[in-house]
A protein has these predicted regions:
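Non-catalytic, topology-defining segments of multipass membrane proteins
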Residues: 1-109, 116, 120, 133-135
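Active-site-flanking alpha-helical
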Residues: 121, 125-126
Length: 136
């Protein structure tokens, strides 16, 4: 149950989807979420003081769920990037909407793109390193 907090990593892609789908002022939902909501949550919520033993750390590393969560970021990032670019190309958007969608895509690429690529780049398997290179 403690591991459910890691699903929070998908909140930026979700807000990016809202930015693209709803457009208008909602095009800035990722910007608002990343620079207002998340800092406020960090301010109000207590930081975990849990110290994991070496065995617990080793068990967490071996869990395939965390690997799958990392791998799932690749199609999510590319899917949202494609969806955003198609929307920018096909829809008649106001300039402020274009800026909002592009800003949201930039936040997505900076968080779920580069961070996941960096993490996968530390892995030893060829598959994981290839995923890392795709995201870079």
């Amino acid at each position: 149950m403690r591991d459910l907090k890691y699903l929070f990593a998908y909140s930026i892609p979700l807000s990016t989807f809202f930015s693209i789908y709803f457009q208008g002022i909602w095009a800035y939902s990722s910007v608002f979420y990343a620079f207002v909501i998340i800092p406020l949550l960090e301010f109000w919520l207590k930081q975990s003081s849990t110290v994991y033993s070496d065995q617990e750390k080793e068990d967490r590393i071996k869990k395939k769920l965390f690997d799958l969560m990392l791998y799932l970021n690749v199609p999510i990032v590319f899917g949202l990037l494609g969806y955003g670019l198609v929307t920018l190309h096909q829809d008649a958007l106001w300039t402020y909407e274009q800026i909002g969608i592009l800003s949201s895509l930039g936040i997505l690429l900076a968080t779920n793109g580069i961070n996941v690529a960096h993490e996968l780049g530390h892995r030893s398997s060829r598959f994981e390193r290839t995923l890392s290179k795709l995201l870079y």
